Swiss-Prot record:
More about this protein: UGT1A3 isoform is part of the UGT1A complex locus which displays alternative use of promoters, first exons and terminal exons. The locus is defined by 13 first exons, which are alternatively spliced to 3 other common exons and 2 alternative terminal exons 5. From the 27 possible mRNA isoforms, 9 produce functionally active polypeptides (UGT1A1, 1A3, 1A4, 1A5, 1A6, 1A7, 1A8, 1A9 and 1A10) called isoforms 1 (i1). Use of an alternative exon 5 (5b) as terminal exon is leading to 9 additional alternatively spliced products termed isoforms i2 and which lack transferase activity.
Name of a matching Pfam family: UDPGT
Primary site of residence: endoplasmic reticulum
PROSITE patterns assigned: UDPGT
InterPro entries according to UniProt: UDP-glycosyltransferase, UDP_glucos_trans, UDP_glycos_trans_CS
Any single GO CC term annotated in Swiss-Prot or TrEMBL for this entry: endoplasmic reticulum membrane
UniProt record, GO biological process: bile acid secretion; estrogen metabolic process; flavonoid metabolic process; negative regulation of fatty acid metabolic process; retinoic acid metabolic process; vitamin D3 metabolic process; xenobiotic metabolic process
Its EC number(s): 2.4.1.17
Organism: Homo sapiens (Human)
Gene Ontology molecular function terms on file: enzyme binding; enzyme inhibitor activity; glucuronosyltransferase activity; protein heterodimerization activity; protein homodimerization activity; retinoic acid binding
Lineage, opening ranks: Eukaryota, Metazoa, Chordata, Craniata, Vertebrata
Protein name in the entry: UDP-glucuronosyltransferase 1A3
Amino acid sequence: MATGLQVPLPWLATGLLLLLSVQPWAESGKVLVVPIDGSHWLSMREVLRELHARGHQAVVLTPEVNMHIKEENFFTLTTYAISWTQDEFDRHVLGHTQLYFETEHFLKKFFRSMAMLNNMSLVYHRSCVELLHNEALIRHLNATSFDVVLTDPVNLCAAVLAKYLSIPTVFFLRNIPCDLDFKGTQCPNPSSYIPRLLTTNSDHMTFMQRVKNMLYPLALSYICHAFSAPYASLASELFQREVSVVDILSHASVWLFRGDFVMDYPRPIMPNMVFIGGINCANRKPLSQEFEAYINASGEHGIVVFSLGSMVSEIPEKKAMAIADALGKIPQTVLWRYTGTRPSNLANNTILVKWLPQNDLLGHPMTRAFITHAGSHGVYESICNGVPMVMMPLFGDQMDNAKRMETKGAGVTLNVLEMTSEDLENALKAVINDKSYKENIMRLSSLHKDRPVEPLDLAVFWVEFVMRHKGAPHLRPAAHDLTWYQYHSLDVIGFLLAVVLTVAFITFKCCAYGYRKCLGKKGRVKKAHKSKTH
């Protein structure tokens, strides 16, 4: 019998031990994370946790004044000073939530909304200026030799920083207003069947909806320019040349979109676009004794989970009382995440909590419905766990999310400004008692979960891929290097049109010349014939 090389067992054990001890260091990398605060940060945290588990070092860079970003054991927190106090930050960024519940003239509300957005933009832009002009911090970041920047491009400052430091970048996002995600990836974006953000259109549009779909971005372009132009100016100042917002975004190696085609409509994609919808559903934990007790006390009726997201801390008293009245008319126990003033008519079946483990509760078999503002995190947690929704969209893409889920039969949408107590009561009874809502959301859940790779693993793979290969230039389309007229082949069309017109002109001239020659010769023959007859 043939025998191979025999390795002594102690040597083999020692070699294996060395391999295991060296391997993490050989593959470990340094990740600079520049997050967006709020719910955007919550799903990014899970990626950092997994990167840490795989031996990578993550440094989270954030202003010292923020909402949710605090030191944790799986990343290093680096903060920088800004000129805003915590009170000013809360007033400008969080102090506008009452606006969502106020009924007033459209123009008045529009201008108030614009003022609110301007204040928020001012906070983030000022923070960006102070970051990029912090020479000591920039030198430290440069010296650290990061392998990749992970950021949400809604924060254009981080994209400018990554480009300035010449570090490969991975974008982690849901979408960017004004179609900047399409422009930044050079992804085809026909308005004929791809609904624009904030239009609430579906992918099957009537003629007038297609008109709206085409005009809406044009109407928003001025607003978008006003908010994005300061970052382009800042980048131009840093690079000492003209830099556009699209130039800044095109630096990204990979785009990780927190979406998929269970929730979103089919659309073209580019090679460096990866879809990780439902990434926030990855880690479900056992419920605490407190919440288990609430569920056990609910009996056969089960529970309803109610949360309007991290940005809404209080609701106007009249609206809160109308909601409390409706909640008191259903047999289920309602767990309501609410930090505002307790409604005086709150029923015994409604429990107010300052925080709740939303995904863990939605995963419990006794959960019957989910009242949500239709933020993408909540909608995906509802899809993952198969819980029908009553949706109260408040701002941004929440209206689009609610429309999509309602179209798919997974829930009911209410206008939070116009709804009455009876409307909410009827909507809750519909999604709880009508089996079609549960069947539809379970079908979406089945489609969403039927995938070869979990979203969290996919996201981590691509971050590591960019670290290993120092970017992903082979996925970058050449469209980034074309001018607008080259991209649309207008120069080729113009050239071909000129050739066709030239050929047509020469052909016409030749025909005209030949015609004149033939006609002239024929005329001379006729004249000669007439002269002979005379």
